[in-house]
């Protein structure tokens, strides 16, 4: 399962993952995340695609790599 926090896309940009939601028509699980650069756009991506491995110069690499957990209010 996906935990909220900071993730790095294989192309180098960081994103804040907010959690997993469900598509209203298909009930497919999607990851809800926000870019931590530019206009900080809000995005969704199918969970399976978010978790998949891509080939970069012939080497397997996670599409998104977990970088850091965000502290809960109790941990602050």
Predicted regions and their residues:
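Mixed-charge, low-complexity intrinsically disordered regions
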Residues: 1-76
């Amino acid at each position: 399962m996906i935990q909220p926090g900071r993730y790095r896309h294989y192309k180098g940009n960081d994103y804040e993952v907010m959690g997993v939601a469900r598509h209203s028509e298909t009930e497919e699980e999607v990851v809800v995340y926000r870019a931590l650069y530019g206009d900080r756009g809000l995005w969704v991506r199918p969970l399976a695609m978010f978790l998949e491995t891509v080939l970069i110069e012939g080497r397997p690499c996670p599409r998104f790599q977990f970088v850091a957990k965000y502290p809960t209010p109790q941990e602050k």
